[in-house]
């Protein structure tokens, strides 16, 4: 049986890039469906994180035009990681796997197929790892390196240069949702499409 994939894409003031990257995400989703890697029930879930521009209106238009696009609109800006978390929690009961990816198109969308293949080979979590940080500013590269060094000195095992680009199985998400140490819940949504 083919897995239902939900791409979880946090959006904050993305009206400039969303019309372009949404098409790229849809092309990859359709390619994976055509190759019979994933179910036709798979979706692209945009999480509007309180954008001040037309991001939500664009998501609504996309959802009206194509059933593979859906969206949730948070009541206010809650931050990037909370938007990702809201999308993952929204998808956990209706998908077999999720892939979180940023809306800006900087991650290699074509590697989704390899991530899905790794899932079929038994992986529950697949990290996207940056091969280069050339497009990052000096400040971002410096702070990222400092962050990893601090974590290593504290004895924390981490995946160096990993991104928010990752596949997570529904089984892992359901376990994660059960943790009570952190308030994990559904998004404070104003609207859904």
Q: Positions of the model-derived regions?
A:
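Hydrophobic targeting segments
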Residues: 3-9, 18, 25, 42-47, ...
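Short, well-formed alpha-helical segments that are part of the catalytic scaffolds
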Residues: 14-35
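Donor nucleotide-sugar binding loop of glycosyltransferases
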Residues: 14-17, 51, 108
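Alpha-helix termini
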Residues: 28-39, 66, 91-96
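Conserved donor nucleotide-binding strand/loop of the catalytic core
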Residues: 42-45, 56-85, 89-90
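A conserved acidic beta->alpha catalytic loop
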Residues: 45-56, 105-106
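Acceptor/aglycone-binding surface of glycosyltransferases and processive sugar-polymer synthases
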Residues: 74-76, 80-90, 97-100, 109-184, ...
């Amino acid at each position: 049986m083919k897995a239902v994939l939900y791409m979880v894409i946090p959006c904050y003031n993305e009206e400039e890039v969303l019309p372009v990257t949404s098409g790229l995400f849809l092309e990859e989703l359709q390619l994976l469906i055509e190759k019979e890697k994933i179910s036709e029930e798979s979706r692209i879930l945009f999480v509007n994180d309180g954008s001040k521009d037309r991001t939500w209106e664009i998501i609504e238009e996309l959802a009206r035009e194509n059933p593979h696009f859906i969206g949730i609109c948070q009541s206010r800006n809650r931050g990037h990681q909370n938007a990702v978390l809201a999308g993952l929690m929204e998808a956990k009961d209706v998908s077999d796997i999720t892939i979180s990816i940023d809306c800006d198109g900087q991650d290699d969308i074509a590697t989704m197929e390899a991530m899905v293949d790794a899932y079929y080979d038994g992986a529950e979590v697949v990290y996207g790892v940056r091969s280069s940080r050339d497009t990052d500013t000096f400040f971002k590269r410096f702070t990222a390196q400092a962050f990893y060094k601090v974590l290593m000195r504290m004895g924390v095992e981490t995946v160096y240069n990993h991104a928010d680009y990752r596949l997570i199985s529904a089984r892992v998400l359901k376990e994660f949702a059960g943790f009570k140490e952190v308030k994990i819940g559904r998004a404070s949504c104003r609207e859904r499409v």
